[in-house]
Amino acid sequence: MGKFIGAGLATIGLGGAGIGVGHVAGNFLAGALRNPSAAPGQMANLFVGIAFAEALGIFSFLIALLLMFAV
């Protein structure tokens, strides 16, 4: 029972990943609307930021799976 509670608590990071991706994409969109000519040059930074934010969610999901099935 305790490992399921721990796994549930570990998935809180998934919500943080969603908030992080939304924050990165929203700020990119706001900047692109202010200066459309600079938007294509910032596309790589957008993808790197989204990848870092999403990686934290994937790590928390893997920790939750490890807590449920390996411990």
Curated annotation (Swiss-Prot):
Protein family per UniProt: Belongs to the ATPase C chain family.
UniProt site positions, description: Reversibly protonated during proton transport: 54
GO MF, one example: lipid binding
Record PANTHER family: ATP SYNTHASE LIPID-BINDING PROTEIN, MITOCHONDRIAL, ATPASE PROTEIN 9
Subcellular location: Cell inner membrane
Protein name per its UniProtKB record: ATP synthase subunit c 1
Superkingdom per UniProt: Bacteria
Residues that span the membrane, as ranges: 4-24, 46-66
Function comment: F(1)F(0) ATP synthase produces ATP from ADP in the presence of a proton or sodium gradient. F-type ATPases consist of two structural domains, F(1) containing the extramembraneous catalytic core and F(0) containing the membrane proton channel, linked together by a central stalk and a peripheral stalk. During catalysis, ATP synthesis in the catalytic domain of F(1) is coupled via a rotary mechanism of the central stalk subunits to proton translocation. Key component of the F(0) channel; it plays a direct role in translocation across the membrane. A homomeric c-ring of between 10-14 subunits forms the central stalk rotor element with the F(1) delta and epsilon subunits.
